[in-house]
Every structure is written in structure tokens, then in C-alpha cells.
């Protein structure tokens, strides 16, 4: 392929750009050989003429086709060069928001500066077990590759994370470690990862600082080794640190800070415990104020310091050590602020003895002040003969002080790392490890010094190792494919490394110059010029004699030699170290001890020891002078070699972190900065190595599918695809060097795939043009015929329309004439009527106007008269008030005068009666006051009487005067005339009004009738409309109400279902956790057994029960205390891994544990007391003779008790009858008055129930007491050595005493009825005397035992009262203290405090009462249950005794007669002996195979076990029932544990366990479970035992088996899902193939073909369904199983779809929809579509539809939002970002469209989780499913070997 073909018109190229580095352009003209320029058009439509270098003939880089842009692996690009790499990273980062990209073996990680939801547990589980190229690039994929290669190759691995400061190295390393912790067995973060994460705050505090590029820059490198055992579980970790930047302790550039710990300590200086540190603000110290700003925006140093302290505590650093660490750090700050004064001579200096900073430094480190002051300013020189003490200049002292500060900090740093390693260390043997290296990338600044030199030197070594590894992998790939290997020219940086570290290299010359006493940086630089000026990698700057340039692999770096020697020496004088060694603080002395580090002072300026606290140190070297010998460069070179040795011994994996911009803006890409880092981190070198060979590689099958369109038809006849591919390539590419045929792949040179894509596109374009031509011609013909037919039709219709329109016109003209005639007539009539009505109206209004005017005049005159009347009245009243006010004033003056006189008289009288007033002050005052009041009232009465008489006379005179005036006015003649006129006017007015009113009445009547009629019609119409509206409203309301009620009911139902599902899920999760804990316990027990078998110290065996599972099941004979202790011990051994359980359950368990502990203590005390009593009685009483009691004593005792109870019963009956009569009388009265007999009937029912309960309780008490007495007698008769007879009953869980009177009566009855006993005949003939003596003796013993018991009770009661007394005393003391505190408060506070105290007291009392009620209720239930059990036992014992007695008598009568048993009907019970139980469990459970029962009844073992349980119930043997059920459950667990991957066995025991559970419910006797039973089945119910608790245990066991069944099925299906659902072509020829990169040929991928098709999944599910149906599993459970499996298929498929770019295409959506439809069809064919499995697939269905929908316009966005309701916003956006067209004819999804989708989905409250939880399990429900079989119809096959079972 010639250059002209490549550079043709419309070809896109890359040209350099100063702003964007590279810019895209398109050729507007073909290029020809010899052209000096190219005609280009830029993306902004600008025309550009691009010149070509004629000498080099270097054309611009070609751009890859759009189909290759955005690939996961950069090596999949056809054209591999810098602009292609940069553009691909930019597109992925900005448009798709993908921060990870592969570049061969390198993972490129771009820091997004934003939290992304791609690091959760679900993502970890999705990447776990996947091949590296199958999923999208991720740090988890690299970690999984390392973990997989470690497990497969058994070789240690390393992950090398590098990059600039702020590029995200630490975060990447953190997520890699989290992945290892999760897949390595520490997913709960409770072991190693938690400690490693806890070390992060510490290492950030002491090793991170603010720089100009990063606020939290790590100033050291670390290598963390995560150790694994043989099972590849994490067992420990170890940390090594490198390149600590010590110089930052004493110097910081502008806008930078020292290490964070200094500022954190200053921020916390105000705390009380840090007062002795004498710290203030960070601005006050020299070492923390050089950079300027001491704070970081958004960072709280005090809060970070608290996190640092917590991390120290978590890692086990003691408080004393923490305080010592902080003292050392504070002392460094004080040391930096010491004031050093130069002397006049300039060769010496001194420090003031009163220097506060030096005093604080010495005090904090515990050293001598005078010695440190002296040796800071002096140094000791040692020669062969003498020792000199020499002064130092100011600069030398400052350098020595800084070196000491750096040395102290470096030693402290090492000590902290050592303790972190101790916390991460494990005693177990490490099998392999994975190391994570977090180290600096290549650095270059404006001024580069010794630190940058060390960093770049380390990166040269790492790049060399990287290049060799890449070269090796390329060679292995070529050899594997059997391609001829040709050497590839790649950059070898060994000459640069030799320049630095070889003999007489830069480091060697630097060490040599450091040995010279007066060596300088200038001399060293001159030596470099002289020695290495000829080297290609060394250059001398033109304008400087103190700088030099090294050509590194990434770039040229200019280093300034100033400070190299001083930093390389880093001299710390031994005298200062010796002072620190003599510190009185152990930690300070330990830091500088010789056996710690032989060369502690020369840790590198930016590189400390390579392995801190990891390797053992060598013995210290004796030095001749007083300063240490090894230089920083030497140590750094040694540590670097050790690191390289470690890395070379492992398989490396590379992560290169890129910083996209310096402003830390989220998802902002700066091309310049990115290119710099890509060049520096070796990514472009990887690209160059790949491009030098055959970077594009295609499998034959993929190549054939992609480029089959280029194959000729005759070549398709060949069936050999390899031969077809060879033929096609030989025809298309003429140069044979451009491709190579490998064993399984075809290798192409760079650009060849792009050329093939061009040919393919041309072929498609030609075919498209041909198709378009043909289709367009056909469309035009069809269009012509359609137009012709349409024209004829239009003509016909138009002509008809015109004729119709003419006829219509004529008809309208005629109608218009008629309308005009009638209209004109109507208009004339209306005009006449209008004129007539107007005249009438005008007349009426005129007449009314005149009338109103006359009326208004008359009205005005009348109103004037009224006004005059009221005015005159008002004037008269005002005159009267004026006269009355004057009279009142005169009266007041007179009264005042009179009062003064009276006052004067009273005063005179008061002076004369002074003595009497003193004697009777009170009475006199009262009398005087009363007398005064009476006088005042009399005077007031007189005054009022006088005023009344005066007022009366005045009013009389005024009335007379007014009468006279009225008479005078009436006599005047003018007034009579006005009155007459007024009367006439009034009469005329009334007549006029009468006429008007009559007329108006007539008009109103007429109009009223008319309006009423209209109104009536309107009302009727309105009423009709209202009725219609009301009817519609009622209908709508009814519909709305029904809809609302239905919606509310549905919402409530959904809520209840959801709550039920959550509760069930929570419970089943607890069951699952319990089973996991049980499994963990078994593992730990096995491990402990192995440990105990090893020689050495062994622990004594515990006295715990040997039964493994008794504690798991309720039993009468099993102690709950022991179970709880076992559970607590298990929790302690497991390490509280599941402590995150529900808090309510946890609190209940705690409470139960406390109760059981108290109960255990009480029982222990009682047991000890009982043992003491027994021992005392054994010593006190002599042995007794045998006692033989007649069993007929029980009959006598029963007769006596029966008589007593009968008498009591008669009394109670009489009382009850009287009560019934009284209630009946009252009820009749109430019925007669109210008529409600319900209360009477209810009361009678209650009385009946109470009566029945009383009778039952009486019988129970009688039977129990009888059994107690008989049991005591038998025990006394059977035990010869029994020392005494206990007064307590021996029934388990019972503490009731035997009644004394009952015991005495019982033994009297024995004495009376036992007159024929022969054993006591030696006393008298009848034996009565001996019998009486024996009875009295027994009674005496009973009384003695009872007396002792009472004394013990009395002692216990006394102790209890003492304890109560002490508690009351404590409470009184507390109350007194509270009272004293209350007195100090204000009154309001006292009231409030008192109320609070009362509330708290009442709350405590309420809680105590509730607890007491719970205990009493619990005790009551327990006693009732025991009473029932004992009653049944007593009845069965009596029946057995009677049966035995009758059998004994019958045997005595018929001793010689043989009786044959008749054959009885099988009652559905199976009898077995106790010793056959183990054989039964072995044959029926442990050794049973499901194939043995293939032709029998399903769930036969469950039926057999129930028949055995029923016989044990029939014989009332509770121990047998308990033992059988416990053994069965344990046997099932053992079988499932043994066959934990056998689906058939698990399904078999799930069906049998559920059937046994159903049988226990069906035959329990509960009416709720007996509704579907037949009469025969009801006869098979249990009679004696309530096995409800065992039903719960079986339910839990069923849940565990179900979860194991799902786990097995998921394990079988999961490897098939991705291949069958996403990769397999269900519709042939639909999907295309795209080129793949290096990761698709990763070493972790298996060579075999593991592809599956959808038929494999359906076939496997058919097998599952058949097995479950054959074994009789309930249909409801089968539905739940397939619902869970379909959810797992949905989750795995969707998660892979969200993490794989290669499957997000239209064709995959089509294939996926087809596969889902096939699964739905399978569900319908098996009648499983009602299980809800289809609903679980809804997210996957919507994802498939999303891949097929249009993605361009706003309407498309709305359609997507309305359709994808089951997908979250993140999932929708992720799929759109991943969507990749398979050919160039399909457009990509634009960024604007994705933003539109995001804007429309903002209102959704979606979870932040991207992936579905594939581990989620729906809660299982076991609905009750009774069996129709009867127990007597079941036959046991002989293959079960159960001949020892007897049918009953």
C-alpha cells in the first residue's frame, strides 16, 4: 500500500498544536510524491497549508477510524502513536467518564477528582474470577490478574503504582489492597486490611505534606507485602518505606508545608495533656513557618490529629509511647527555633543559656541542657595521637542542628513503621505474597536538586525493569504463535543508569568529593564535566558552571549542584547522638541505640533505609572519627538494589496514574500535562515497542467474521477458514511483511487494520450505492404510477364537485329572496313596537318625576319640624344639666366645710382619749370607722333628699312654663293655615300613591305570573341539569372512592408484603449467618484438634458436653445455661465477625445471658448447699436396713385423699350453685329491664370454664402428690445406703416442697393398711409395732429434712434481706447526695430536677415491673407445660402399673399356657429399640442414596421418621422423641456437609425435611392444620407431645438446605451465563467483531474454549426441574428456586453488560432480547411463569431495549426515560457511555444526548449503587402442604434394611 493511497482526499491526520498538543485535520487534496505541503481543513472549517519536511519526508500521523476510538486497550488501535493514545484517553475520560484504560500490560488510571461508585463490594465480586480482558479496565482487574497468577503459578506478584504527586497512587494502592482483603478471606475488614487502613492516618500524618501540586502529597514510597497461606487467604502484611524526604523537616519552599503531624500537634496544643509540650501556633516555629500559609483549605488539623491518635490506639501503641512520640515531634519544633548567635571572630558561635526553646528541647527529650548546648556549637576531632574540640561557624552549627533534627525525625519514622509491621505481623507461615509498590513517578521542576535526582534515578531502574518485562512478554507471545522472532529496537536506559551508578559515575564521584575535607559542589560539578562530557546522556548547560543535565528516558532534566554534598553527607556528630542515647526516656534512648541501626545518621535526604524494621542489622562498625561514614547516595543505591531484587523475583503488574490537570477540577483534561506524564511513566514506550512489531492481532474466526465481505464468492466454497484468510490477505495486502500467520492468530503491522477497515467501508459503500440506485429507480416508477392514478381521480372528483356547487348556488339564491321578505316584515314590526313602547315609557317617567318632586317638598317640611322639636328639647336638657352641676358644686363645698369642722372635733377628742386608743386600737378604729360610715350615709341621704325636692320643684316650674308657651303658639292664626295646607297635600299624596300602587299591582301581577312561569321552566331545567350533574358526580365519586380504596388497599398490601419479606429475609439471613458461624465453629474445632495433637503445652480438656448439636435444639433435659456458654465461647473464638446483627436480637441475647448467669449461680449455690447437707447427714446417721414398703399404701393414701377432696368439692359446688342462683336472679332482672342476656351467658360460660379448670387442677395436684409419696417410698426401699429422705420432690425443674400434713397422713395410712407385712414379724405377731415404728421414723426424717430446708430458706432470706438493706443504704446515700446537689440549685432548677428524678424513678420501676411480669408469665407457662407433662406421665405410669399387675396375675394363673397374638391392623406407627436408633439414622439418613428410592413414594424417609416419632409419642417417651429428632437433624446436616456440591442430594433432603415439617404440622392436633385431614388421618395425630419448637428448628434447617441448593445451582449456572447470554450468537450473522488489544490475549486466560450457548442453560435448568419434581419437592418451593435463579441470571448478565464495552451494541441488544424470550418461553412451557421470574428479568429486558432504541432527539430521550423504569440513572448513563457501534455507518451516542438523559432523570431517587447485588437472595417461604397419604398405607422397601422396625 503506497503513501499516496494512505494520504488521499478525506483522510484525517494529526498535526502538532501549541495549545492542544495535537490537532485533527482532514486532507482536501490527494498527496503525491514530491509535494512540499498538504492541503488540510481543520475541525473549525479553517483551511491550512501544512509544510512537509522534504529531507526527512515525515508526513503527519494518520488518525484511526472512528470505530476504533474509545477502545479499552490502546494496543487495539491500528495506528499506534502519541496523538492516537492521547485522543483515545481524552475521549474515554471526558465523553465516557472512564478513568481506566489498558495500554498493553499497563493500566492507565486518570484521577477524576471526584468520588465514583465503582469500588463497592458488588464490583469486587463481579471482577472476581473474570479474565482480565473480558471486563472493562479497572484496578480490580489488575488485582484479580495478580491474585489469579499467584494461585496458578505459585509465584509472588507485585503491583507497581507510580505517578506524579496528586495522580491518585495512594488511592489505587488502597483499592488493590481492599480487593485482596475481600477475595482473600477478609471481606468484613476486621483483620489485616483494617489494620493497614488504620495505619493510613498515621503514615499520612508523618509522611505526607502540602506541596505546590498536592495538598496531601506522600513524601515517601512504600511497598506493602500482603501475605497469603496455602489456601490463599490473607494471614499478614508487611510495610517497607523508601525515599523519605527528610529535608522537608528543616526547609519548605513557598506555599508548602512541613509534615502534617507538626501542624496537627500545634492545633491540639490547647489540650490539657499537651500542656507540657509548650507548643503554640505553627506560625511561631521556624520549621513550620517557612512556607508561608500554615493551613490548608478544607482541612481541620485538630480533627485529623484525633484520627491519628485513634489509629495509634487501634494498632496497639500504648498511651505512654504515644506521648513520647509527641514529645519527640514537639522537641524537633523547639530545636528548629533555637537562637544561635555568631561570635565576633566568625569561626565560633554560642547559644544563650536562657534560651527557652533549647530548654524545652532538652526537657522533652530528657537530656542534659549544658551538654546539648555545648555540643551543638562544638565538634570533636580525633587523630591518632590526640583529640581536639573545635568550634564551628554559624552555618556549620545550623547545618548540624538541621541534620540532627532530620535524623531524629527519620529514626522516629522508622520506629513507627516498625510498630506498624509488628501489628501486621503473623506467626503463621507465609506461602506467597502480593506486593503493592506506591512510589514517586518521574519528577522535574524549575530547580531540581538532590531529591529529584534520587527519585529520577529510581524511576530509571524501574523503567529498565519495565522495558525488559514488556520485551519479554512480546517475545513469549511471538514464540507461542510460532512467528519468526526479529529483534525489536527499544529504548535501553542502561547507559543512563551506568552514568549514575557505575564506577566513577555521578554517585561515585559525589561520594569521593564528600570524603575530601574541603570538597565543594563546584569542584564536584567540574569533575562531572571533565569525566562525562562525552556521554550521550550527560550535558553541560551553556550559561552555568554549577548545573548539569541528564538525559533521562522521559525527558532532559537540569540539576543544580548546590547542596548535593551537604545533603549527601547529612552529617550528624556522634557527641550529639551520645547525648540522646543517655536520655532518661526509654523510647528516646532506644531510637539511637547502636544495635538498632549501624548508620543511623545517614538516612538519605529523600530516601531512608530500604527496609525499615524488616531486616536484622549487622553489628555496629567502629569508626575512627566522630561522624558516621556511609553517605546518603550509597544507602539509597543499596536500598534501590534491594527493591529491584524483590521486584525481579516477582511477576510485576503496572498501574500508571495520570494527573489530568493541576487545578484539581473534576473531569477536566489538560493535554499538555497528560502528554508529559505519558512520556514520563513509560506508556508511550510501551506503545512504541508494540508498534515496532505486529501490534494488531486477530483470531482467524474473528477476522473471517469481520472481513467476510472482502472474500470472493468462489473462495467461500472452501471450509477451511485459515486458508480463506490467507487467500484474502495475499490478495489485499501485497507486502508480505505487513502481516504474519500465527498458530491461532493473524499478526498485522501498524496501520494494516485501518487499511482493511477502509477496504471494508469502500465495499459497503459500493454495495450501498448499488442498492440505493435500484431502490430509487423502483421508488420513482411506483411514484409515477401513483401520481397518474391520483390525477385521474382528482379530475373526476373536481368535476362532480363543480356541478354540485352550481346547484347549491341556485338553491341558495331562491332561499335568500324568501328570507329577505320575511326579514323585512319582521324588522318593520319590531321598529313600530319599539317606538310605541318608548312613548309609553317617556310618559310614565315624566309623570313620576312630577309626583316625586311634590313628595320631596312635603317631606322636607316635615323633617324641618322634627329637627326643631329635637333642638328645643336638647337646649332644655342642657339648661337643666347646668343648673344641676351648680347645685352639686355648692353641696360639695358645704360638705367639705362641714367635714373639716368634724375633723377638728375628732382631733380634739383623739387627744383626750389617747390612753384608751392605745389599749383598744383595733376595736376603736373599727367602731370609729363604722360610726363614720353611718354618719356619712345619713348625711348623704339627707343631701340627696334635698336635691330631689329642689329638682322636683324646678321641673314642675319648667313644665308649667312650657305649657303656657304651647298654648300661646297654638293660638296664632298663621300656624293653622300651614297645618291645613299640609293636610291637603297629604290627602292628595295618598290618593296619588293609591292610584300608582293599584296600577303597579296590576303590572306586577302580570309580570309576576309571567316570570313565575319562566322561572319555573328554568328551575325545572336547572334541576334536571343539577340532577344529571349530581348523578355524574356521584358516579365519579363512587369510581374515585373505589379507585382510592383499591389503591390504598394495594399500597397497604404492598407495604405489608414488603415488611413481611424484609422480616423473612432478615430472619433467613440470621439463619444463614448462624449456619456460617456453625461451619466456622466446626472449622475452628478441627483446627484446634490439630493444634492440640501437636507436641508441646496442651490445655486441659473442658467439661463441656460431647454432644455437638444438643445446644441447638430445645429440650427438657438440656440446660440452657450450657448452651449459652457454648454460644458465647463460639462467638469469642470466631472473633465477633457477625457482630453487625440486629441490635434488638443482640440486646435480647445479652439480657438472656445475664438471666441465665444469675440462674446458674443460684443453682450452683443450691447444689453446694445440698451437697453439704448430704455430707453432714451421711456422717451423722448410721446405715439403715432395707425397707420394703407395700405398694398397696398408695391405694390407701388415694382413698383418704379422695374422701378429703370429695368433701371440699361438695363445699365448692354448694358455693358455686349459690353464686349461679344469684347471678341468674340478677340476669332475669336485667333482662326484664334491658333485655340483653349476653353478659349472663358469658358469665356462666366463664364459671363453667373455671369449674372445669378447678377440677383438672385438683386431679393434677392429687396425682402429683401421690406420685411424690410413692416415689419417695420406692427410693427409700431401693437405696440401702441412702442417708436421709429429702423433703423436696425429685421431679426435674420443680422446687415445690412436700406438704407436711399430707406426708404424715400418707404414712399413717401405710401403717393402718399394712397389717400383713412379714418383714417386721420379729417384733410381734401382727407386725403392727414395727410398722408403726418404721412409719414414725420416716415421718421424723421428713420433718427433720423439712426443718433443715426451712432453716436454709431462713438463712437465704436473711441474706436476701441484708442485700436489700445494703441496696437501700446505697440508694439513701445517693438520695442524700442528690438532695445536697439540689440545695445548691435555684428553686426553678430544684423543681425541674425533682420532676426529672421522679420521672426516672417511675421509669425504672415500670421497667422492673415489666421485667417481673415477663418472668412470672414465663414461669407460669413453664410450670403449666411441666404440669401437663407430669400429669400425662402419671397417667401413663398408673396405666403401666395396672397393666403390669394384671399381666403378672394372668401369668401366675396361666403360667403353662402359651398365648398367640392375633394379627392387628397397622396403625401407622413404627416401633424401634433405643439401641437401634443409630442404625436407623445410618440406614435412613446418612448412607441413603436418592437413587435407592426412585420407584417409591416421594419423601418416604420423612414418612418413616414421622411414624417412629408417633410411636414414641404413643408410648409417651419424651427422651426418645428428643433423641430421634436431634439425631435426624444432625444426620441431615452431616450428609449435606459431605455432599455440599450435589444438587440431587440437597434437593432430596430439602423435600424430605419440608415433608417432615408438614407432617408435624398436619398431625400436631392444631385445628388450623387439620382442615384438610380425613377422619383416618386425624387418628394419626400426636397425642402427648407438642413439637412446635422442633417445627421451628426444622424450618430453620429447611432454610439452610434451600440456601445450599441455590448456592449449588448458581455455581453450576454462573460460568454459563455470560457466554450464553452475551457472547454466543443466538441469531447467526447479526453481531460483528471488533479488534481486540493485548488484554484479550492475557496470560490469565485459559487456552480452552469455555463458550456456552443458551441451550446449555435451558438444558441445565431442565435437569434441575426434573430432579426437584421427581423428588416430590413442593411446587411453591420450585417456583421460588427458579425465581432466584432467574434473578441471578439477570444480575450477572446486567453487571457484565455494565462493565463491558464490547457487548454494548445494537446487535447485542437484539441477541439479548431473543435469549430472554427463549427463557420466558421455557418458563411458560414448564408452567413456571407465575413464579415472578420474568419480573426479576425486567432490568435486563429494559437494558436490551435501551441498546436497540434511537438515541438522537429529545423525543428519544423522553422515550428512554419513560421506558427504563427498572434501571437506575447511573445504569442508563453507563450503558449509553459504553454504547459502541460495530461499524462506521452507525453514529455514536453524543455527549449532549447523555446530558439530556441525566437532566430528565434528576428527579429520580435512585440508589447510588451501579451494579446489582448478585449475592442477594429472596426470602424463602414454605407454605403448608398437607399430604393425602395415610400412615397405614405406606410400605417400607427392603432396600432400606429397616427390618428392625416393627409395625404397630
Swiss-Prot record:
All copies of domain Dilute, residue ranges: 1526-1803
The keyword Cell membrane appears for this protein: no
Q: Which residues carry this modification: Phosphoserine?
A: 1446
Question: What are the GO MF terms of this UniProt record?
Answer: actin filament binding; ATP binding; calmodulin binding; microfilament motor activity; small GTPase binding
Instruction: Please tell me, according to the UniProt entry, what happens when changing residue 1079 to H.
Output: In PFIC10; uncertain significance
Annotated region (Disordered) at: 596-630, 1093-1123, 1166-1192
Q: Where's the IQ domain?
A: 769-798, 792-821, 817-848, 840-869, 865-896, 888-917
Q: What is this protein called?
A: Unconventional myosin-Vb
Name the species this protein comes from: Homo sapiens (Human)
Lineage of the organism: Eukaryota, Metazoa, Chordata, Craniata, Vertebrata
